[in-house]
């Protein structure tokens, strides 16, 4: 499995999402609620722009010294009694995780929410080997039951309302209780606790790894990650190679930004720090700890003009403010990484063949630039993708032909002049009362809702020449 979540073509996906009123209402409500809470926390903290500057500096410093910090982290984890595996590709990562599971004769694995494990497709690899995988994040658990991919990096089931969730629980687990969040959460919690107690392995992601101590930081709202790391005898943490902080001082800044940007809170419900396996005399924690550090294309991104995207701390703030995401939801992007960050990172990790449309799923309003806690210039990176695709000839054939025609006309003044005159006359014929009977594909609806400027059949060149002559005459 790749980061691709749908084989449906982009235009069809967009149409399906726009025609889904439940999804659009759910996403709009979530954006409004999270956005309002975020603003309260930003105002409360104060000096927000300075905090953003500091967070961006920390992430830039790590990326510029990534080799040194990866080495330091590896040494510390090993000293703490853990095992470190550097995975160049997603296949390397899943192969190692499967080997650990098979060596432990694991029949069941419990997982906390992790984007990088979604990225490498670890669930499918383990399930194909006959190992049961249980997602323990509330949203991910519901989506797993419904065989539905996540649509947000923080709130995976943002596109579902409680009526749909109850239907899933009823059809998959026989739930007969009321349609209240409290009752449904209690029902799921009771189900998952049985899995926590019987699983041989717990798999988590890693929000940040501390190079100085070899510690892994897990940030959750439900506490399920603590259960995944304390009850099973083996804990496997999977992290993208860029998710490092030098010391706890830097993590303090990043967590401050993460919680406020992700859900509009001072802190998330649970912040868990893990430093190696259980020590002698301790009553909980895993007997064995593995840290899988995943590259999967990140080295190439680091060496490219898109390296700034690796600052990302997966807060989802860009999705929570994006007008395009509001209308098409996460599934419209066809990637586990949706929204503005997905429009940048999906083509880098998954290739332009599958994700060439995503850089165009953006109005370039720059709202994402203004909320990103680590100052990733997302709109500039999206434009950069468009430029790269144009240079590589990946854009639509019709667009390529139009650009060639424009370039040819622009380099032949006589032809350009004739074209401008013809266009001016055509505009005067087809625009009446601010409307035109012509249809222009995707922008037809946009044009119907707006009054077009009246045209008098005169090109700007001829108008300018006429007025210039008049000024000289009056001069």
From Swiss-Prot:
<dbReference type="InterPro" id="IPR003741">
    <property type="entry name" value="LUD_dom"/>
</dbReference>
<feature type="binding site">
    <location>
        <position position="372"/>
    </location>
    <ligand>
        <name>[4Fe-4S] cluster 1</name>
    </ligand>
</feature>
<dbReference type="Pfam" id="PF11870">
    <property type="entry name" value="LutB_C"/>
</dbReference>
<dbReference type="Pfam" id="PF13183">
    <property type="entry name" value="Fer4_8"/>
</dbReference>
<keyword id="KW-0479">Metal-binding</keyword>
<dbReference type="InterPro" id="IPR017896">
    <property type="entry name" value="4Fe4S_Fe-S-bd"/>
</dbReference>
<dbReference type="GO" id="GO:0004459">
    <property type="term" value="F:L-lactate dehydrogenase activity"/>
</dbReference>
<comment type="similarity">
    <text>Belongs to the LutB/YkgF family.</text>
</comment>
<keyword id="KW-0813">Transport</keyword>
<feature type="binding site">
    <location>
        <position position="315"/>
    </location>
    <ligand>
        <name>[4Fe-4S] cluster 1</name>
    </ligand>
</feature>
<dbReference type="InterPro" id="IPR024569">
    <property type="entry name" value="LutB_C"/>
</dbReference>
<feature type="binding site">
    <location>
        <position position="318"/>
    </location>
    <ligand>
        <name>[4Fe-4S] cluster 1</name>
    </ligand>
</feature>
<dbReference type="InterPro" id="IPR009051">
    <property type="entry name" value="Helical_ferredxn"/>
</dbReference>
<feature type="binding site">
    <location>
        <position position="312"/>
    </location>
    <ligand>
        <name>[4Fe-4S] cluster 1</name>
    </ligand>
</feature>
<feature type="binding site">
    <location>
        <position position="368"/>
    </location>
    <ligand>
        <name>[4Fe-4S] cluster 2</name>
    </ligand>
</feature>
<dbReference type="GO" id="GO:1903457">
    <property type="term" value="P:lactate catabolic process"/>
</dbReference>
<feature type="binding site">
    <location>
        <position position="362"/>
    </location>
    <ligand>
        <name>[4Fe-4S] cluster 2</name>
    </ligand>
</feature>
<protein>
    <recommendedName>
        <fullName>Uncharacterized electron transport protein YkgF</fullName>
    </recommendedName>
</protein>
<dbReference type="GO" id="GO:0051539">
    <property type="term" value="F:4 iron, 4 sulfur cluster binding"/>
</dbReference>
<dbReference type="GO" id="GO:0046872">
    <property type="term" value="F:metal ion binding"/>
</dbReference>
<feature type="domain" description="4Fe-4S ferredoxin-type 1">
    <location>
        <begin position="303"/>
        <end position="333"/>
    </location>
</feature>
<dbReference type="Pfam" id="PF02589">
    <property type="entry name" value="LUD_dom"/>
</dbReference>
<keyword id="KW-0004">4Fe-4S</keyword>
<dbReference type="InterPro" id="IPR024185">
    <property type="entry name" value="FTHF_cligase-like_sf"/>
</dbReference>
<dbReference type="InterPro" id="IPR017900">
    <property type="entry name" value="4Fe4S_Fe_S_CS"/>
</dbReference>
<keyword id="KW-0408">Iron</keyword>
<feature type="domain" description="4Fe-4S ferredoxin-type 2">
    <location>
        <begin position="352"/>
        <end position="381"/>
    </location>
</feature>
<keyword id="KW-0677">Repeat</keyword>
<feature type="binding site">
    <location>
        <position position="365"/>
    </location>
    <ligand>
        <name>[4Fe-4S] cluster 2</name>
    </ligand>
</feature>
<dbReference type="InterPro" id="IPR004452">
    <property type="entry name" value="LutB/LldF"/>
</dbReference>
<keyword id="KW-0249">Electron transport</keyword>
<feature type="binding site">
    <location>
        <position position="322"/>
    </location>
    <ligand>
        <name>[4Fe-4S] cluster 2</name>
    </ligand>
</feature>
<keyword id="KW-0411">Iron-sulfur</keyword>
<dbReference type="InterPro" id="IPR037171">
    <property type="entry name" value="NagB/RpiA_transferase-like"/>
</dbReference>
């Amino acid at each position: 499995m790749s980061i691709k979540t749908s084989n449906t073509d982009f235009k069809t996906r967009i149409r399906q999402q726009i025609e889904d009123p439940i999804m659009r209402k759910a996403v709009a409500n979530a954006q409004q609620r999270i956005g309002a809470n975020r603003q309260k926390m930003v105002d409360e903290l104060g000096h927000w722009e300075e905090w953003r500057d500091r967070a961006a500096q920390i992430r830039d410093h790590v990326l510029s010294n990534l080799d040194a910090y990866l080495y330091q982290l590896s040494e510390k984890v090993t000293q703490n009694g853990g095992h470190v595996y550097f995975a160049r590709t997603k296949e390397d990562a899943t192969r190692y995780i499967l080997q650990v599971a098979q060596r432990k004769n694991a029949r069941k694995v419990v997982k906390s929410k992790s984007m990088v494990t979604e990225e490498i497709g670890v669930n499918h690899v383990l399930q194909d080997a006959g190992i049961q995988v249980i997602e323990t994040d509330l949203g991910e658990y519901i989506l797993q039951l419904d065989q539905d991919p996540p649509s947000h990096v923080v709130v995976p089931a943002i596109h579902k309302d409680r009526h749909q969730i109850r239907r899933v629980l009823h059809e998959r687990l026989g739930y007969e209780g009321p349609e209240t969040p409290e009752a449904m959460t209690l029902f799921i919690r009771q189900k998952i606790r049985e899995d926590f107690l019987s699983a041989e392995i717990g798999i988590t992601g890693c929000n940040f790894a501390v190079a100085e101590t070899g510690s892994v930081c897990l940030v959750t709202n439900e506490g399920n990650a603590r259960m995944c790391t304390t009850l099973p005898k083996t804990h496997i943490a999977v992290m993208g190679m860029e998710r490092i902080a030098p010391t706890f001082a830097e993590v303090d800044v990043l967590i401050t930004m993460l919680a406020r940007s992700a859900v509009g809170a001072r802190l998330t419900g649970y912040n868990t720090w893990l430093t190696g396996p259980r020590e002698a005399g301790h009553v909980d924690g895993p007997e064995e700890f593995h840290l899988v550090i995943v590259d999967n294309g990140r080295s190439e991104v680091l060496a490219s003009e898109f390296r700034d995207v690796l600052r990302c701390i997966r807060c989802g703030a860009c999705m929570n403010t994006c007008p395009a995401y509001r209308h098409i939801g996460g599934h419209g992007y066809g990637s586990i990484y949706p929204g503005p960050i997905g429009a940048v990172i999906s083509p880098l990790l998954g290739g332009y063949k599958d994700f060439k449309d995503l850089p165009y799923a953006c109005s370039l309003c720059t709202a994402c630039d203004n909320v990103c806690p680590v100052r990733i210039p997302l709109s500039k990176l999206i434009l950069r993708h468009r430029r790269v695709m144009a240079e590589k000839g990946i854009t639509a054939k019709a667009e390529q032909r139009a650009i060639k025609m424009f370039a040819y006309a622009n380099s032949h003044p006589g032809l350009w002049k004739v074209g401008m005159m013809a266009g001016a006359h055509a505009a005067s014929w087809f625009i009446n009362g601010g409307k035109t009977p012509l249809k222009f594909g995707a922008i037809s609806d946009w044009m119907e809702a707006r009054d077009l400027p009246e045209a008098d059949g005169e090109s700007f060149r001829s108008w300018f020449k006429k007025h210039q002559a008049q000024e000289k005459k009056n001069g």
